[in-house]
Design a protein with these regions (language model features):
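A Zn2+-metalloprotease active-site environment signal
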Residues: 1-179
Length: 179
């Protein structure tokens, strides 16, 4: 599945490695160098090959869109600005505030990158002969799991915080479904 998607991506000559992790967590992620990981826990919620292709295509999208290098540049810029503010003012509080602001800015770009990866992944799926709507199905599964975690937390008296908090790199799943 992965190699078929790569062959129909914007970087068909790059080398990608796909690994299934024995983890119950509902997650998948990409690392620089074309390394893509899917957790066993996510597979339990997928019903079709096309849905798995959607997960993998989204992660390929992070790599083809150079999200890792863009995020690194943004983080470096944020650190330089915070350090400059500290040097100019001598205020540790200003440094901390600048770092927090920088983290939020980087996080905001991350949300945009998630939507870019969704769009790139949908294109790679289409070119590979998969129904790109399967990616929407996966996002729907993630939204359902997010709601389930909230209900469980509330029922057990725990805070109903969500994975998609202030500094999360992912947009809300309902926003992703609308896009």
């Amino acid at each position: 599945i992965g190699q078929r998607l790569v062959a129909n991506s914007s970087r068909p000559n790059d080398t990608f490695t796909f690994t299934l992790l024995d983890s119950p967590d509902i997650n998948a992620f990409a690392l620089p160098g074309g390394f893509i990981y899917v957790n066993r826990g996510l597979l339990a919620y997928l019903e079709t090959e096309a849905e798995l292709a959607g997960v993998i295509a989204h992660e390929i999208g992070h790599i083809t869109e150079s999200h890792h290098s863009r995020r690194s540049t943004q983080q470096t810029t944020s650190t330089v600005l915070a350090t400059t503010a500290y040097i100019l003012t001598g205020s540790g509080d200003l440094y901390d505030a600048a770092q927090m602001y920088g983290a939020e800015v980087v996080s905001g770009f991350g949300r945009d990158m998630e939507l870019e990866a969704d769009a790139a992944g949908a294109e790679f799926m289409h070119r590979s002969g998969y129904d790109a709507d399967a990616l929407l199905s996966v996002i729907g599964v993630l939204k359902d799991q997010e709601m389930y975690r909230r209900v469980q937390a509330k029922a057990s008296g725990k805070p109903t915080g969500t994975y998609h908090g202030l500094y999360s790199s992912h947009p809300r799943n309902d926003l992703r479904l609308q896009t």
